[in-house]
């Protein structure tokens, strides 16, 4: 009892501190100002749905830079990077990233599917081309989405996902973005061991963070 007592106390204090940290983070996410709005990204993508995806993406990037100057990565920092996660394989091009938001282009040139992941973030996908099938946890039927549709993945939700070859979309995420990286990088670390892709992914996210830091300090006149 004498040995277990201090150990139990430390565990209890640790859990209490962690709970307070989570509560504080939740409050911060709820009250902070966000650069983007889900409806804005969805409407912009919907406007170009049905076009050739490369043409649509180029138009979307131009419009985002006009609406959010200083918050979209420059052309020289845009790179399509493979993503292996949850058993599926796709490719993403990061446009914007911070601790609480991201905007990226995502898709696949082959049929692929797997587990969506469960995040501390809300994710909005608006389809430009192809089809997206989603099977939600606790249900016995799947739904298919088409160009122009927006799929909302709520925080804490898990689904089965499947994309047909040639499916491309615009994705907006809002929440504690670093919490999504564990899932996004797990297959790379423990399955494919494609450490070059790991480097590309972390480099893109770092560039996004640095761009946001620069934008923040510019508002302070630094």
Swiss-Prot record:
Compartments where located: Nucleus inner membrane; Nucleus outer membrane; Nucleus envelope; Cytoplasmic vesicle
Give the Cytoplasmic membrane side ranges: 30-222
Region feature (C-terminal hydrophobic region): 176-222
Q: How does it sit in the membrane?
A: Single-pass membrane protein
- Region (Important for ligand-binding): which ranges? 98-105
InterPro entries given in the database record: ERG2_sigma1_rcpt-like
Biological process (GO) annotations held by this record are:
lipid transport; regulation of neuron apoptotic process
Provide this UniProt record's keywords sorted from A to Z: Cytoplasmic vesicle, Endoplasmic reticulum, Lipid transport, Membrane, Nucleus, Receptor, Transmembrane, Transmembrane helix, Transport
Q: What's in the GO CC field?
A: cytoplasmic vesicle; endoplasmic reticulum; endoplasmic reticulum membrane; membrane; nuclear inner membrane; nuclear outer membrane
User: Where is the chain membrane-spanning?
Assistant: 8-29
Q: Would you say which domain of life the source belongs to? A: Eukaryota
Q: Which residues lie on this side of the membrane: Lumenal?
A: 1-7
User: Quaternary structure per UniProt?
Assistant: Homotrimer.
Q: What does this protein do?
A: May function in lipid transport from the endoplasmic reticulum and be involved in a wide array of cellular functions probably through regulation of the biogenesis of lipid microdomains at the plasma membrane. May regulate calcium efflux at the endoplasmic reticulum.
Q: What else is known?
A: Sigma receptors are classified into two subtypes (Sigma-1 and Sigma-2) based on their different pharmacological profile.
Give the domain note. Answer: The C-terminal helices form a flat, hydrophobic surface that is probably tightly associated with the cytosolic surface of the endoplasmic reticulum membrane.
Name of the featured protein: Sigma non-opioid intracellular receptor 1
Gene field: SIGMAR1
């Amino acid at each position: 009892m004498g040995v277990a007592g201090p150990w139990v106390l430390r565990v209890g204090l640790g859990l209490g501190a962690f709970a307070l940290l989570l509560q504080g983070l939740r409050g911060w996410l709820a009250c902070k100002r966000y650069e983007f709005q889900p409806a804005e990204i969805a409407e912009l993508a919907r406007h170009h749905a049905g076009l050739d995806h490369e043409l649509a993406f180029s138009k979307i990037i131009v419009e985002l830079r006009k609406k959010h100057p200083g918050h979209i990565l420059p052309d020289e920092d845009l790179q399509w990077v493979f993503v292996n996660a949850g058993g599926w394989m796709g490719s993403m091009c990061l446009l914007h990233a911070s601790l609480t938001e991201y905007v990226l282009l995502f898709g696949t040139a082959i049929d692929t599917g797997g587990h969506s992941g469960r995040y501390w973030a809300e994710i909005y996908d608006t389809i430009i081309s192809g089809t997206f099938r989603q099977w939600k946890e606790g249900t016995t039927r799947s739904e298919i989405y088409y160009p122009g549709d927006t799929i909302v993945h709520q925080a804490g939700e898990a689904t089965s996902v499947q994309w047909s070859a040639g499916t491309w979309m615009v994705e907006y995420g809002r929440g504690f973005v670093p919490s999504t990286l564990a899932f996004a990088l797990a297959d790379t670390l423990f399955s494919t061991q494609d450490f070059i892709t790991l480097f590309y992914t972390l480099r893109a996210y770092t560039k996004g963070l640095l761009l946001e830091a620069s934008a923040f300090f510019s508002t302070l006149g630094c």
